[in-house]
Amino acid sequence: MWTVVLGLATLFVAYYIHWINKWRDSKFNGVLPPGTMGLPLIGETIQLSRPSDSLDVHPFIQKKVERYGPIFKTCLAGRPVVVSADAEFNNYIMLQEGRAVEMWYLDTLSKFFGLDTEWLKALGLIHKYIRSITLNHFGAEALRERFLPFIEASSMEALHSWSTQPSVEVKNASALMVFRTSVNKMFGEDAKKLSGNIPGKFTKLLGGFLSLPLNFPGTTYHKCLKDMKEIQKKLREVVDDRLANVGPDVEDFLGQALKDKESEKFISEEFIIQLLFSISFASFESISTTLTLILKLLDEHPEVVKELEAEHEAIRKARADPDGPITWEEYKSMTFTLQVINETLRLGSVTPALLRKTVKDLQVKGYIIPEGWTIMLVTASRHRDPKVYKDPHIFNPWRWKDLDSITIQKNFMPFGGGLRHCAGAEYSKVYLCTFLHILCTKYRWTKLGGGTIARAHILSFEDGLHVKFTPKE
């Protein structure tokens, strides 16, 4: 036992010395942004991981901005990081992508999503491919031509099931709903083989991405790796079964990836599993969180519910068959619904920051950011700018009527920006609009409890959101 303890102590001391020397031996000339690096190894990770009960920018970032200004340095999960809440700086960094900076995830998340393998050696080529295959199956054309009816059917089935229950915890229930829709699109009939609480495991992974990469029993990182391996095992079984019994000719997401494997050198079976893992996660987590926040905010603002219901009833009554399916033209006409979604995304900022990494020393605004440092662009701060949004802390969907497209483009970034605008943005909006149309025309809902915000590096709900759904007469 003492041998183990002494060994761990030696390891810690060695890492501490390495960490200190790393800063002392930095070979660059220039001025770093102001700030503090915190403790060895953990930096200031604990402060950012501490939940806040507000939708506002996290208190850790607010306090740092008040003390050091909108650009400051820190250390998160063992990585040196420059954090920026400066709009001009953030725009400049996004324009530098492919030149001075590249897309980046902190080491923990990179491990979870397989980005410490061959992916990073061909990041530009891989991103182009992932964007292409995602748009092919989840983009506007696919939604308009094929996918919208499946989203509508999934929403109707879920709401009918929820209406038979005395109470529904919306975050978990909606995560399962969206996950099933997404994997059915990705795997077709093989989606039935993905049993178990995979959405729950994915949510745990997201919650643990700021954890220190210490892989031994009891650590958050170890638990997340275990969940990751269990999910990947199920995905590998689906891929192997498809190859053994069907082949690559099925026209779903998996089928296209297997077919592309024959012509693209960087695509291997392991790459496909990591791709399926990443897209499965990305396709549901943000939608379910946004949907939960929408219902929380609607419960607090009945005047918004009234106008929302009026818009959807008008769409329904204008049909030849009021109970007929939603059309693409109807979706595009849901103006106020999209304003509600935009306002929720502005306040909620489900993903409140973007991460990049410098590939060379970068000089900007009088500072130097050394090669290899992470840059955290706090896009959520722009969503609270009173110069752009009057009374920015108030939920007001009507504000979007007066905002022009250029102002929105520069100051509203819920789906990323620059070269990395989310390929699934339209899918998210279509899903939310479709769900709200069915909800507003066929159901009433009552909040029973929960809804407490827990904002850390992600948005979550401390006690869920418990709702009773009742069919309209």
Curated annotation (Swiss-Prot):
Q: In which tissues is it expressed?
A: Highly expressed in young fruits 15 days after anthesis (15-DAA). Also observed in roots.
Pfam families assigned to the protein according to its UniProt record, in alphabetical order: p450 (PF00067)
* Ribonucleoprotein is among the record's keywords: no
This protein's GO CC annotations: membrane
Matching entries from InterPro entries are given as: Cyt_P450, Cyt_P450_CS, Cyt_P450_E_grp-I, Cyt_P450_sf
One example GO MF annotation: iron ion binding
What name does this protein carry? Answer: Cucurbitadienol 11-hydroxylase
Gene that codes for this? CYP87D18
